[in-house]
Amino acid sequence: MAPPRYLLMNSIWTAVAAVLMGGALAASQDDGSASPAETWPPNPERIALLPPVEFNLEEDTFSSEPIADADPKAGTPQRRRGGSPFGAAAPVSLGGFWAPPTDVVGQPATLGMNAQFARVAAPLVPPKEGEPLWIGIGRFGRLELSTDAILPDSQQPMPDQLWLVETGLTHIRPLARGGTLGGTFLFGSASDRPFAAGRDLTLMAIGFWNTPAANERDEWNFSLFYSPTSQLPYPLPGVAYAWRPSDALEAKLGVPASIEWRPDEKWTLSAAYFPLVNVAVEARRRLGNDWALLAFYRTDTQIYFLADRLIDAERLYVFDQRAAVGLERAIGSGFTVEALASWLFDRELFQGTNFTSGRTDSVEFDPGLGLSLQLLWRR
């Protein structure tokens, strides 16, 4: 059974999703004279030649990504169609994160963090409308733990550096009857000594099929997700109904689940959930053409294989919850700079064969500040 605080996180997702959906439906009823085609934003069906490719649901590298695939040059966000059901992110991003030392619970030590990360996703051949798309993906992350703390059960020192190095492909194929079929395969290593042994290798495999619903406005999303470095290291099927009652509201009802509501041209409110306890809630407000203010709550889980672990199936989990505020600035040519200040809490590090049971070497550390800066290119 999941610990009570994890059940609370899932309750937060449920409550926020209900509030957003209720508000969106109430707003659409109050504006009853408008049909879906007449509501904001205009021209929602712009064809995206480079659709969303980010499937990194649980190993998100220490900084927020907008759930909306907004183009900083456009006056309005665009509706997403035809990509993976697993979300969206910038094709190129790089940045860093820093959290000053805080006290380790039960040990005479402190623990500080800093991280650097980069990601790129690019089409391998020039994309063409209505044609299959092949996308190459590369990801890199380095997390440094500055501490004298030890893993209490094994009495081993805390790893000082953890690495994520992955590369792979995404394929998206339009179907003649509408909808898309595709998948992603990523291969690499997530470890304190990457590629040191075969047991330290990891992969992420995703298959998805999106098909239009009977009303031709909505979609059914079917998917299968597997990664040994996930909170649920087993194949996880997904079924979701993408409900679009208006151009201002889109909700994916099922697994993975999400909702995005744009009450006007300045505000975007969103929430997303993926098992087991991956929750993200975000509010974003445009401040003119170049600036945006954002605030979010989310959980963050980093998962690695320690090279010297005694049990092959054991993983190292680095977990926290965080609330953040920040600013985005569009600097031209599709580039955006994002600066965030976060409050990190419920912070822990532990080993286990899965996320909810069989834990060893559990280390908790005090809440504290986190600062991040990243550069994104959104095409």
Question: Which residues are covered by each model-predicted region?
Answer:
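Transmembrane beta-barrel domains of bacterial outer-membrane proteins
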Residues: 36-213, 217, 303, 311-324, ...
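Structural signature of outer-membrane beta-barrel domains
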Residues: 97-101, 139-145, 188-192, 227-231, ...
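Outer-membrane beta-barrel "beta-signal"
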Residues: 238-242, 325-335, 341, 362-379
